[in-house]
């Protein structure tokens, strides 16, 4: 079953733009750089499994650059290349779990650790007034990369409902 898990609170921080090196050269994206439709289209085309490396596995093995905010033996936090808020970063496990719905009982400690890292990194990024955590799961949940990841969004007043 596909789902999107969303946890929310209020917020406020400075707006940012990100320069992204890609196949079309360097692009600069602001907080509204990608539309919901773009992400849904990506999710519809994303392969939910397979042997091909994901963009996140390539960031983990350092074959793709990332603006890393935090790293330990279990996870990595880095800025999103297409931010949807003034502050938008991802927290990913180093263990390749494709979807939250495929996490196992043995992943319980790791999943809790990801949330704590999200909280501490949000604090370090100045999101003391609040932020939102999002985990997309599966095609209908608009998951576009099949490596579990938590989006942390903040730096402005977020709206409800999100979808």
Curated annotation (Swiss-Prot):
GO MF annotation, one: nucleotide binding
Residues that coordinate or bind AMP: 63, 80, 136, 142-145, 149-151
GO annotation terms (biological process): apoptotic process; steroid biosynthetic process
Chain ranges for the short sequence motif Histidine triad motif as given in the UniProt record: 147-151
Enzyme Commission identifier(s): 3.9.1.-
Enzyme class label: hydrolase
Keyword Coiled coil: no
Keywords: Acetylation, Apoptosis, Hydrolase, Lipid biosynthesis, Lipid metabolism, Mitochondrion, Nucleotide-binding, Steroid biosynthesis, Transit peptide
Location of N6-acetyllysine modifications: 119, 139
Active site feature: 149
Transit peptide: 1-17
InterPro entries registered for this protein in UniProt: Histidine_triad_CS, Histidine_triad_HIT, HIT-like, HIT-like_sf
SUPFAM superfamilies in UniProt: HIT-like (SSF54197)
GO cellular component: cytoplasm; mitochondrion
Catalytic activity, as annotated: adenosine 5'-phosphoramidate + H2O = AMP + NH4(+)
Boundaries of every HIT domain copy: 55-163
Cellular compartment(s): Mitochondrion
Family of this protein: Belongs to the HINT family.
Functional summary from the UniProt entry: Exhibits adenosine 5'-monophosphoramidase activity, hydrolyzing purine nucleotide phosphoramidates with a single phosphate group such as adenosine 5'monophosphoramidate (AMP-NH2) to yield AMP and NH2. Hydrolyzes adenosine 5'-O-p-nitrophenylphosphoramidate (AMP-pNA). May be involved in steroid biosynthesis. May play a role in apoptosis.
Stated name of the protein: Adenosine 5'-monophosphoramidase HINT2
Source species of the chain: Bos taurus
